[in-house]
Amino acid sequence: MSMAKQRLKLVIPGSHGLNIAAVLETPELEPKAYVLYAHCFTCGKDNMAASRVSRGLVAQGFAVMRFDFGGLGASEGEFADTNFSSNVQNLKDCSDYLREHYQAPSILIGHSFGGAAVLATAGDIKEVAGVV
């Protein structure tokens, strides 16, 4: 098992003009794959479930990006102005960022509400091989 090599705090430009706060954790060695994690309704990228899942996957050699949906955590915007479509777009924006700067996610993980957003997004990310 490898420990996290890096924990990068990222600011991803959202397609709606609002920045998305994200964290990318990578293992010591070349990642087996990149994972994009979507949190539950009104939670955030740093909640206990997201952090534990991320640490576990990094220990197994995966790189994991988790982010705050718009209006939550450190992401810009007002929660009251968000909806399911804007959350799906946040996922696509994060996927595009990974593709451009690292490697597109091949695994999407969603917790509760994040799971619904992941299912709605999976077909639009051609590299996705698995959804949890």
Each language-model region and where it sits:
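Short beta-strand element of the alpha/beta-hydrolase
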Residues: K32-C40
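Conserved Rossmann-like nucleotide-binding pocket used by diverse enzymes
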Residues: Y37, A63-M65, I109, V132
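Conserved alpha/beta-hydrolase
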Residues: S54-E76
